[in-house]
């Protein structure tokens, strides 16, 4: 199967809002996580080559559920997690979907890794490091992907990459991938890394 077609057939299956609604497809899952408004929906649309798959918004915290997308029938499931950080939702709603996300990450039998998005223009925030430390604590494998690199200079991009390389991390999966959903930069590399993870 050609690299460009691996993720091309994407079907939204369910938006889980509570633990009992979490599905079990019994096939590999890759979760996408990140701070609110980091560009998760745009990245999903870029790697599936369809702008309509995931709804995008300029307002942070719009995803209040865990969205499951079936990729190429039974190849894998792409899991869109709610953004952490600032949200216009009320505190009860925020707490509910963060608890749901935590439960999913700790209990999914099919999760292979988390793709953690970092806004390259903003850089690493304390809340990003808190989430990384949480993943490390629970021995959950993750891969870092920098987004919106078309909006920064290469020098700033290098600062972000070198920063994380200098941390003592045990469960990070390399390489760190730099992407732009708008310019399609790094998208094929990310698809390749996802495919390699599924094949292992």
From Swiss-Prot:
Q: Which cofactor does it need?
A: Mg(2+)
Which SUPFAM superfamilies does the protein's record reference? P-loop containing nucleoside triphosphate hydrolases
Any GO BP annotation: division septum assembly
Which InterPro entries does UniProt cross-reference here? G_ENGB_dom, GTP-bd, GTP-bd_ribosome_bio_YsxC, P-loop_NTPase, Small_GTP-bd
Family annotation (PROSITE patterns): G_ENGB (PS51706)
Which residues of the sequence carry a binding annotation for GTP?
A: 34-41, 61-65, 80-83, 147-150, 179-181
Q: Pfam families under this entry?
A: MMR_HSR1
Where is each EngB-type G domain found?
26-200
| GO MF annotation, one | metal ion binding
Residues annotated as binding Mg(2+): 41, 63
Keyword Nucleotide-binding attached? yes
Q: Which UniProt keywords apply?
A: Cell cycle, Cell division, GTP-binding, Magnesium, Metal-binding, Nucleotide-binding, Septation
Q: Which family does it belong to?
A: Belongs to the TRAFAC class TrmE-Era-EngA-EngB-Septin-like GTPase superfamily. EngB GTPase family.
* HAMAP family linked: GTPase_EngB
NCBIfam families registered for this protein in UniProt: GTPase_YsxC, small_GTP
Q: What does this protein do?
A: Necessary for normal cell division and for the maintenance of normal septation.
* PANTHER family recorded: ENGB-TYPE G DOMAIN-CONTAINING PROTEIN (PTHR11649:SF13), MSS1/TRME-RELATED GTP-BINDING PROTEIN (PTHR11649)
Protein name in UniProt: Probable GTP-binding protein EngB
Q: Which species is this UniProt entry from? A: Ehrlichia chaffeensis (strain ATCC CRL-10679 / Arkansas)
């Amino acid at each position: 199967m050609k690299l460009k077609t691996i993720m091309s057939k994407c079907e939204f299956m369910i938006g889980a809002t509570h633990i009992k609604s979490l599905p079990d497809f019994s096939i590999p899952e890759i979760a996408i996580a990140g701070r609110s408004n980091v560009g998760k929906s745009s990245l999903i649309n870029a790697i599936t080559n369809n702008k309509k798959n995931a709804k995008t918004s300029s307002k942070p915290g719009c995803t209040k559920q865990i969205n499951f997308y079936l990729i190429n029938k039974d190849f894998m499931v792409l899991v869109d997690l709610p953004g952490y950080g600032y949200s216009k939702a009320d505190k009860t709603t925020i707490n509910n979907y963060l608890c749901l996300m935590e439960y999913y990450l700790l209990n999914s039998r099919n999760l292979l890794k988390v793709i953690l998005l970092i806004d390259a223009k903003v850089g690493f925030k304390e809340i990003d490091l808190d989430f990384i430390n949480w993943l490390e604590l629970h021995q959950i494998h993750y891969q870092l992907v920098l987004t919106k690199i078309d909006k920064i200079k290469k020098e700033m991009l290098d600062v972000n990459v070198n920063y994380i390389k200098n941390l003592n991390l045990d469960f990070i999966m390399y390489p760190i991938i730099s992407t732009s959903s708008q310019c399609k930069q790094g998208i094929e590399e990310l698809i390749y890394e996802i495919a390699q993870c599924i094949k292992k």
